[in-house]
Amino acid sequence: MIKKSLLCTALSVTAFSGWAQDTRPDTLVVTANRFQQPRSAVLAPITVVTRQDIDRWQSTSVNDVLRRLPGVDIAQYGGMGQNSSISIRGTNASHVLVLIDGVRLNLAGVSGAADLSQFPVSLVQRIEYIRGPRSAVYGSDAIGGVVNIITTREKPGTELTAGVGSNGYQNYDVSTQQQLGENTRVTLMGDYAYTKGFDVVAYGSTGSQAQPDKDGFLSKTLYGALEHNFSDTWSGFVRGYGYDNRTNYDSYYSPGSPLLDTRKLYSQSWDAGLRFNGELIQSQLVSSYSHSKDYNYDPDYGRYDSSATLDEMKQYNVQWSNSIVVGHGNVGAGVDWQKQTTEPGTGYVTDGYDQRNTGLYLTGLQQLGDFTFEGAARSDDNSEFGRHGTWQTSAGWEFIEGYRFIASYGTSYKAPNLGQLHGYYGNSNLDPEQSKQWEGAFEGLTAGVNWRVSGYRNDIDDMIDYDPHTEKYFNEGKVRIKGVEATANFDTGPLAHTLSYDMVDSRNAITDKPLARRSKQQVKYQLDWQVYDFDWGLTYHYLGTRYDTDYVTYQPVKMGGVSLWDLAVSYPITSQLTVRGKIANRFDKDYETVYGYATAGREYTLSGSYTF
């Protein structure tokens, strides 16, 4: 394990003194610059979600976790397991880089966007979520932000969990972490989740035949990890996980042809790494392999019938990252190598293709008096597009003790994926998307309130979109995004408050039309308190107006705003047994995040966990 105390001492001078007045310990994060540092030293806005948060919210999906976070806007084609997209600060879903333990999530299919409706929430032990450009650190895709899902469990022992809920929801989970001798730790986990679901199509067209069925979801997950400390400075790990998902959905139907209304996703990932953690130097070498097979088929014909579709992707990664404490800060450097291969038929590609990318990056953080400076530069060599460079820089000025002003600028890009280039809907003439972003922010600690207010602008050239008329991907030109984000957290006696407000104006800079499925405004509020050992949580989410397209008439539609309330409670019956209950969408609001696709309405869940 990293010598956290030594690293904190070396970097503590960069930590913002206003946060030091808070009684809560400063969390260490790794996602911002690829080296471990106190969260308060990071100039970009970053949010950390722990497993304790997820259990307290009683979230049954990763999307339910992420929707609570600042800047996140989720559009989903129905309920649990249905296709979804994540927008951060008004950008496309393909502009969100999703990492699993620091490694890019393998994405099968044409869109190039991470669909986290399929990723098991049972695997999530921690999330580090950073907003703003990060291509200078991670390469392609990191235009809107980075979501790093960490699966490493820090809690020893064994836990058994079972839950039931509305729409036939069931969940059974067992996990254990055991010490094998003084220097070896093993972790195992298995999870089963199922829901009968509901009919996801609210209105619109599914062809010549209605499909008034329930669209359910089934997921089975296995996870294993082995960690070993060879000495005080050297350690290694081997880790693997896989999940097998089945999703039923409503699809377009015409008489005499198969109805492709079932999705079957197989995914497996393996990685191994070696770490060196000295007093001033850290180094890590990680290699990984992932393989996903995504079928869409008619159950009457089977997934191997000629009518079925298959998206199959293999991904190979090697990462070597290094950092050294220098002066009042840190310098990091490393290299990434990635190879992605598609099998014939993937994304309607008739032949198999592969794409290779090698990236070199340099990062740095330094404090000079009341000023903190952060920078990064990266060069990517892509087999499809050649060499591409990105950079970013930030500066923070603590002009009064406890109050800081931050200014930042960064460039980023998104390369088209293999399906967008070579698939049936592809366009081999696509150019990479280019982004330039500016942000200014004030933050501080006032009367016990930790707050941050920021304004940002993001200009994206050659943004890739899909044209339903031509059935092709194309570069639609220039997109302009402007926004304001405000966050705060504070305690009033036994009550803990977390609040965020987002106002985003994202539109095509040429036509001045707003981009689809982005809320103009969002308000998110979390209230937590404890009374007689009962832990209560109240969640409020205002989802503002947004625009979409009616794909029957191809006319734009405006969807009104909605206020959603959740209530959760847990009670420890003993020191080992805890029961939990939740009401989601307490007032049973009828709303949509994708036009024509219903949401679940009011739902109840009840669960219990036993630890030993």
Swiss-Prot record:
Cellular location(s): Cell outer membrane
Keywords: Calcium, Cell outer membrane, Ion transport, Membrane, Metal-binding, Porin, Signal, TonB box, Transmembrane, Transmembrane beta strand, Transport
Annotated residues for binding of cyanocob(III)alamin: 85, 92, 110-111, 309, 517, 551
Sequence ranges assigned to domain TBDR plug in this UniProt record: 38-152
GO cellular component: cell outer membrane; pore complex
Any Pfam family: TonB_dep_Rec_b-barrel
Binding sites annotated in the UniProt record for Ca(2+) 2: 213, 215, 249-250, 261
Span of domain TBDR beta-barrel: 155-612
Motif (TonB box): 26-33
GO molecular function, one term: ABC-type vitamin B12 transporter activity
Membrane-related topology note: Multi-pass membrane protein
TM segment ranges: 158-165, 169-178, 184-195, 217-227, 232-248, 263-277, 279-296, 309-325, 328-337, 353-369, 371-381, 385-400, 403-417, 434-443, 449-458, 473-490, 494-509, 517-529, 535-550, 556-570, 583-594, 600-612
Residue sites binding Ca(2+) 1 per the record: 199, 211, 213, 215, 250
Its job: Involved in the active translocation of vitamin B12 (cyanocobalamin) across the outer membrane to the periplasmic space. It derives its energy for transport by interacting with the trans-periplasmic membrane protein TonB.
Protein name as annotated: Vitamin B12 transporter BtuB
Originating organism: Citrobacter freundii
